[in-house]
A protein has these predicted regions:
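Conserved catalytic cysteine-centered active-site region
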Residues: 28, 32-53, 80-148
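Buried hydrophobic packing segments
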Residues: 56-63, 133-141, 179, 220
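Active-site glycine-rich loop that binds ribose-phosphate moieties when present
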Residues: 132, 136-139, 152-175, 218
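Conserved beta-strand elements of the Class I
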Residues: 5-7, 71-74, 149-151
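Phosphate/pyrophosphate-binding loops at sites that engage ATP/ADP/AMP, CoA/4′-phosphopantetheine
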Residues: 58-71, 218-230
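Condensing-enzyme catalytic core mediating Claisen C-C bond formation in acyl metabolism
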Residues: 1-49, 164-226
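Acidic, glycine-rich active-site loops and adjacent beta-strand->loop/helix elements
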Residues: 12, 76-81, 124-128, 154-159
């Protein structure tokens, strides 16, 4: 069986650093005490004008030297509007949809000078989109015999005015990336697995917390079984 590996992990956070107390004044649902008791201390937000593309460029910076032979870039977005850096005002003015298809993954490909790399976008998987990109990368390496290195990247900023909290977790703006390849370096991927419950797409925070441990127990056991581990 072909083996795949994850290596060259890197990340970047929004340029504005706050304390939990500062963010809890207006940008969270929970109190500062509850967030601190949950383990949160600092909060990072994108600066004004700092885009998901900017964060992505910052994230790949430390591993730039390892990205010289990319065959694919998979950009994973949690929030759908982060899948484009296009100008909606320009679209409304011109009524041409082209500005809405100004994809950050294509811009990142150009920034990395990787014209040989195909570009894919992944969305509608929320906070597990990065894990989904790794699974897609393994699929590409399986079917495309000439592919060797695939950059998986996720980058998200909350929209202006949003509360930076989901399911009692404080969320920062940021980006993260890794390279999935056949080279036996970094971490070997033993198995990929996921569970999708489409009926729970708009579940409340309370409902999400209620089913979390049930699903975690199930998915951990199913993943271990798939990897033939106990």
């Amino acid at each position: 069986m072909t083996e795949f590996y994850v290596d060259n992990l890197s990340y970047a956070l929004g340029s504005v650093k706050r304390t939990v107390d500062e963010s809890a004044k207006s940008d969270t649902f929970s109190s500062a005490k509850l967030l601190r008791d949950s383990g949160f201390e600092t909060h990072h937000l994108a600066a004004e004008g700092e885009s998901v593309l900017d964060l992505a460029v910052k994230a790949v910076g430390p591993i730039r030297g390892s990205l010289t032979e990319l065959h694919a870039i998979i950009w994973a977005s949690c929030i759908p509007e982060n899948a484009t850096v296009g100008d909606r005002v320009q679209f409304e003015r011109s009524r041409d949809v082209k500005p809405l298809m100004d994809f950050p993954a294509s811009r990142l490909q150009s920034h990395l000078d990787a014209p040989q790399a195909i570009v894919l976008g992944l969305v509608q998987q929320a906070c597990t989109s990065m894990l989904g990109s790794v699974r897609v990368a393994c699929g590409l390496l399986t079917t495309e015999g000439d592919f060797e290195n695939i950059l998986c990247l996720t980058s998200d900023c909350f929209p202006s005015g949003a509360k930076y909290e989901q399911s009692y977790s404080l969320i920062s703006d940021g980006a993260a990336c890794c390279v999935v390849s056949r080279k036996p370096e970094g971490y070997r991927i033993l198995a990929c697995h996921q569970i999708t419950n489409g009926a729970a797409v708009q579940a409340s925070d309370e409902e999400t917390a209620a089913v979390y441990f049930t699903y975690m127990n199930r998915i951990v056991n199913e993943t271990l079984a798939k990897a033939k581990m106990t």
